């Protein structure tokens, strides 16, 4: 199970499905840059569950693009694009394109709803018990495809190579009076966008995932995303 999950929503959904597919799933946390840099190899007896959140209808735009460090050997894979109750748009198509170019074939794809990072309303408390039922049925279908030896890759809607979108701006705030200098935000940032000396965010590297805000133990970080929230909820 390989996932990118800055605030935990995608990870939760991926773990829920993974336990229905395997008794002992192994996890690769692509939220950590070092695991996006390391080559990851998979055999034809493996099954990869690749999970990513949807950012503006696409994969997050990272310097080390997700799943590009993977190498399969005619390895079956399941795609999961987790989104905040708007739309997954091109994300699954992107994932399929990236992984099939690297030795995988897609036997299943799912787009569960998770809490939206910019809205308390959208995707609240998801995945829930009803989602779990859907996951279980999906897992049964995937296992059957594997048992039947079906190796034909699924057709996935969307544009596999969309033009990168400019994300709506998020204004970040840092309160030096609350900061304890613990460096948690620096260490946990998935794109290394926070200066370790000044704690200021390098906007050109920031993907607006809000991980720094969520992991700060002293509440020194906050952000203004009201314009994004209003756009989403209206």
Which residue ranges define each predicted feature?
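Short, hydrophobic/glycine-enriched beta-strand segments
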Residues: 1-5
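Iron-sulfur cluster-binding cysteine motifs and their immediate structural context
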Residues: 174, 180-201, 211-228
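A mid-sequence, solvent-exposed acidic-amphipathic segment
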Residues: 154-182, 186-190
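FMN-binding flavodoxin-like domain, especially the glycine-rich phosphate-binding loop
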Residues: 7-32, 38-169, 224-234
């Amino acid at each position: 199970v390989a996932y990118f999950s800055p605030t935990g929503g995608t990870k939760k959904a991926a773990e829920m499905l993974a336990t229905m597919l395997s008794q002992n799933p192994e996890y690769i946390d692509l939220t950590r840059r070092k695991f996006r840099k390391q080559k990851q190899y998979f055999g034809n007896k493996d099954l990869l569950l690749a999970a990513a959140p949807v950012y503006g209808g696409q994969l997050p735009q990272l310097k080390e693009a997700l799943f590009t460090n993977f190498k399969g050997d005619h390895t079956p894979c399941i795609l999961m694009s987790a989104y905040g109750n708007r739309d997954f748009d091109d994300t699954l198509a992107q994932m399929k394109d990236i992984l099939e170019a690297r030795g995988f074939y897609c036997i299943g794809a799912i787009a569960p709803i998770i809490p939206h990072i910019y809205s308390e309303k959208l995707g609240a408390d998801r995945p829930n018990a009803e989602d779990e039922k859907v996951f279980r049925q999906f897992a049964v279908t995937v296992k059957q495809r594997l048992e039947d030896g079906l190796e034909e890759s699924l057709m996935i809607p969307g544009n596999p190579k969309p033009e990168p979108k400019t994300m709506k701006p998020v204004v970040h705030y840092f309160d030096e009076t609350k900061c304890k200098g613990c460096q948690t935000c620096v260490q946990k940032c998935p794109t290394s966008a926070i200066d370790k000396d000044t704690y200021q965010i390098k906007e050109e590297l920031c993907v607006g995932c809000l991980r720094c805000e969520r992991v700060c133990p002293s509440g020194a970080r906050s952000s203004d995303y009201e314009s994004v929230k209003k756009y989403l909820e209206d």
